[in-house]
UniProtKB/Swiss-Prot annotation:
Protein's name according to its UniProt entry: Eukaryotic translation initiation factor 4E-binding protein 1
Residues modified to Phosphothreonine: T36, T40, T45, T49, T69, T76
UniProt-annotated location(s): Cytoplasm; Nucleus
Alphabetically ordered keywords of this record: Acetylation, Cytoplasm, Isopeptide bond, Nucleus, Phosphoprotein, Protein synthesis inhibitor, Translation regulation, Ubl conjugation
Length: 117
């Protein structure tokens, strides 16, 4: 930068705001404190930095090709990052859906694990 350059200031403008009158707080359940009716999410970091995610931006990120591709150099963990080698993934997920009444104990108690003695 040269010593002879001048800086021009832009005029300040007010930030547009909108006030919404809420009744007794019933309109906002506890999970919706950081969202707006338009779908914008906002939060702050422990350092005080404000983070605002617009709904349109989040939807674009969700539908982007980058979000649909798996990360590179992902380790192979059977059953977590890849299907188990013993059974296909469809059979594994369906086996949990069809549990017989004999598997469950009376009174809602289920054993944490089984042990042969």
């Amino acid at each position: 930068m040269s010593a002879g350059s001048s800086c021009s200031q832009t005029p300040s403008r007010a930030i547009p705001t909108r006030r919404v009158a809420l009744g007794d707080g019933v309109q906002l359940p506890p999970g919706d404190y950081s969202t707006t009716p338009g779908g914008t999410l906002f939060s702050t970091t422990p350092g005080g930095t404000r983070i605002i995610y617009d709904r349109k931006f989040l939807m674009e990120c969700r539908n982007s090709p980058v979000a649909k591709t798996p990360p590179k150099d992902l380790p192979t963990i059977p059953g977590v990052t890849s299907p188990t080698s013993d059974e296909p993934p469809m059979q594994a997920s369906q086996s949990h859906l069809h549990s017989s009444p004999e598997d469950k104990r009376a009174g809602g108690e289920e054993s944490q694990f089984e042990m042969d003695i």
